């Protein structure tokens, strides 16, 4: 780990202290943008947002940037993470590879359609949690709001406790809104380092209930696979009809920088400027979007590129707070809330307002296409660089889950794009 190869060395990105205040200030400044128009520009994307009093003419809507999702083409994933005192390495790897893991799903298509991605997050084994709840907490239900998942993940702190795997699997099985459709991919990934059989809830019972709902439970041991604990985690995977992995939680995540990362970062900044908050929580959620960019970038520019790739996909939707996504989902809501928008928008006539939305939407799609092109080039560069490197495969959380996802999606009839 950490060897240099040619002009593009691999880098081990250390964890940095993260302060949100500067980013919240940036979010506030972004939210005060009052006039958004399109002007031709060089560099990232075909468009650049600028302040001007003119209204750009509406352009013909471009073709969709990616395959559309359907309700019958869904992937649901719950991550159950041990946050007892010995699990700092596990949580660090989860933070470092969240966007890389989600990016694997973006490569999947079935019948030419991209899947909808829903993610849930639990943590367990933490002494700050209530013992009557089994030291377990649901941090997020199944949701398409991946920024919320990232926010909860980056807030996790470890603290010693008792780890009850059967209990947390049972809670995830019972509490989450799992799709009843057999075509939906339903996966649980549980990671920890103590015996899988601890606690009052028998693991075999919880796993049986999950299997009854078509949920596949995969187990990830952070430790020696050849000891007694390894046997219990293997047995858990067998009963859960899933896969067993073991990882070295202390192994540092290795990033391969690329010549495309800087351009991707610039595109991402411009993409953010196409988001206009709407509703009572709009400004706060816009600030969270920027905060999660900062969290991703705290692990390096290459990691931000992985997040930008997801943000450029059809799975990144923010209808709850973004003007454009809200208009796509419910135009009547936008009209009702129009007067709460900045004067540069609220004072426009209906025709001018629709022109503005169309222009802004075209700018976003242009930037998304640009990011997709750049990240595809980046992926090819990284893969070629990795093939040139010698050594063993990565034994980290992200690498194991990514490989597992590819295998499972192929089994369910998905095609994985290169």
Model-identified regions with their sequence ranges:
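Intrinsically disordered, low-complexity, compositionally biased regions/tails
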Residues: 6-10, 138, 283-286, 304
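N-terminal secretory signal peptides that target proteins for export/translocation
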Residues: 1-18
């Amino acid at each position: 780990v950490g060897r240099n190869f040619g002009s593009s060395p691999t880098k081990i990105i250390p964890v940095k202290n993260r302060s949100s205040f500067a980013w919240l200030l940036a979010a506030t400044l972004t939210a005060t943008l009052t006039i958004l128009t399109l002007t031709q520009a060089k560099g990232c994307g075909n468009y650049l947002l600028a302040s001007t009093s003119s209204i750009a003419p509406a352009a013909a809507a471009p073709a969709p940037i990616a395959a559309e999702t359907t309700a019958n083409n869904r992937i649901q994933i719950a991550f159950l993470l041990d946050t007892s005192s010995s699990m700092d390495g596990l949580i660090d790897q989860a933070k470092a590879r969240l966007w890389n893991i989600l990016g694997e799903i973006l490569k999947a298509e079935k019948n030419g359609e991209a899947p909808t991605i829903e993610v849930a997050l639990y943590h367990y084994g933490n002494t700050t949690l209530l013992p009557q709840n089994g030291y377990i907490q649901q941090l997020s239900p199944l949701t398409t709001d991946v920024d919320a998942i990232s926010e909860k993940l980056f807030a996790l702190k470890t603290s010693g406790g008792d780890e009850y795997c059967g209990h947390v699997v049972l809670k995830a099985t019972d509490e989450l809104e799992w799709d009843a459709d057999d075509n939906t991919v339903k996966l649980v990934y549980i990671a920890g380092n103590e015996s899988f059989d601890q606690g009052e809830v028998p693991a075999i019972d919880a796993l049986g209930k999950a299997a009854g709902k078509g949920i596949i439970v995969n187990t990830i041991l952070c430790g020696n696979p050849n000891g007694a604990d390894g046997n219990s985690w293997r047995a858990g995977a067998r009963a859960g009809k899933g896969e067993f992995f073991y990882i070295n939680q202390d192994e540092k995540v290795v990033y391969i920088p690329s010549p495309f990362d800087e351009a991707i970062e610039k595109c991402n900044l411009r993409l953010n400027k196409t988001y206009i908050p709407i509703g009572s929580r709009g400004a706060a959620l816009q600030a969270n979007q920027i905060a999660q960019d900062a969290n991703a970038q705290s692990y390096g520019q290459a990691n931000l590129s992985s997040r930008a790739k997801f943000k450029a996909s059809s799975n990144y939707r923010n209808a709850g707070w973004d003007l454009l996504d809200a208009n796509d989902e419910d135009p009547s809501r936008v009209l009702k809330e129009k007067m709460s928008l900045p004067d540069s928008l609220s004072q426009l006539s209906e025709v001018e307002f629709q022109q503005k939305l169309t222009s802004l939407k075209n700018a976003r799609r242009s930037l998304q296409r640009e990011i997709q092109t750049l990240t595809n080039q980046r992926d090819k560069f990284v893969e070629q660089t990795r093939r040139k490197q010698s050594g063993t495969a990565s034994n980290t959380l992200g690498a194991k889950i990514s490989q597992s996802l590819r295998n499972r999606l192929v089994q369910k009839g998905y095609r994985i794009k290169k």
